[in-house]
Amino acid sequence: MRGLSRRLSFPTLIVSCQARADNPLYGPQFMAAMAKAAEAGGAGGIRANGPEDVAAIRAVTELPILGLYKQWLEPYEVYITPDFAAAQAIAEAGADILALDATPRPRPQEGLAELIERIHTELDKPVCADVSTLEEGLRAVELGADCVATTLAGYTPYTLKTEGPDFALLRELVQALAVPVLAEGRFWTPEQVGRAFELGADAVVVGTAITNPREITRRLVRSVPR
């Protein structure tokens, strides 16, 4: 049974535990520690990137893991779980839900419809569609996506990057879709999180504001008198 409800309880806060290679906290051991801290703080789920991080987090928590695999494959713009091999790798590492780029941009292997179908039939995992527009969300659900996230709003060439969370897109998705909608992207304050739930989000995903001390420090340092 791949049902989403047995993996996530809504409403909830999902903490994204990810670090780029240039971050001092890069490494599975650090992401596992972040996940444990998030669980202790009351998080209802973890979003994590790559089989090594997913496996390390799986070893220290029973929280649902929303897994993805970022792979930059030239010349393609799609990098969030771009093909079935990536999806299989994070599923085998212990991810409960598989997140993928659900934009219409070219992909290196399977088309979006085939990818979602293979994840369902071969891996028996629910799919979270990361989108940047309402149209992408509608199409993803038509193709079988089990939930939709605003992850890519402002991160595609054809969408405007808002200063904070894209509440307009969130509102549109909530009103149009019958599947759970996850709000993600540029959340920094409790007020923004509360606003997302007021608009009908089933979950809010917060990453940098919780798990990136370097960026948090940079934001605070901007207020130091020069």
Which residues does each predicted region cover?
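Hydrophobic faces of well-ordered beta-strands that scaffold small-molecule active sites
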Residues: 11-17, 46, 65-69, 98-100, ...
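C-terminal alpha-helical cap/extension of soluble enzyme domains
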Residues: 2-25, 29-32, 165-226
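Amphipathic, soluble alpha/beta structural segments
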Residues: 40, 120, 124-147, 199-225
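A short alpha-helix capping/helix-coil boundary motif
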Residues: 11-16, 33-34, 64-67, 94-97, ...
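Conserved N-terminal beta1-alpha1 strand-loop-helix module at the mouth
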Residues: 1-92, 125-127, 135-143, 223-225
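Glycine-rich phosphate-binding active-site loops on the catalytic face of alpha/beta enzymes
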Residues: 18-20, 72-73, 93-106, 147-160, ...
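Glycine-enriched alpha-helix->loop->beta-strand junction motifs that scaffold or abut catalytic
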Residues: 42, 61-65, 93-97, 121-124, ...
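Active-site-adjacent beta->alpha loops and helix N-cap segments on the catalytic face
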Residues: 24-28, 47-66, 77-83, 102-119, ...
